[in-house]
């Protein structure tokens, strides 16, 4: 999966 801007 994507891990962009995951906070």
From Swiss-Prot:
Keyword Zinc-finger among record annotations: no
Main location: secreted
GO cellular component, as recorded: extracellular region
Tissue expression from the record: Expressed in the CNS but not in the ring gland, midgut, thoracic perisymapthetic organs (tPSO) or abdominal perisymapthetic organs (aPSO) (at protein level).
Keywords attached to this entry: Amidation, Neuropeptide, Secreted
Subcellular location per the Swiss-Prot or TrEMBL entry: Secreted
Gene Ontology biological-process entries: neuropeptide signaling pathway
Modified residues annotated as Phenylalanine amide in this record: 7
Residues that span the membrane, as ranges: none
Similarity comment: family membership: Belongs to the FARP (FMRFamide related peptide) family.
Protein task: FMRFamides and FMRFamide-like peptides are neuropeptides.
Name of the protein this chain belongs to: FMRFamide-like neuropeptide GDNFMRF-amide
Gene source species: Delia radicum (Cabbage root fly)
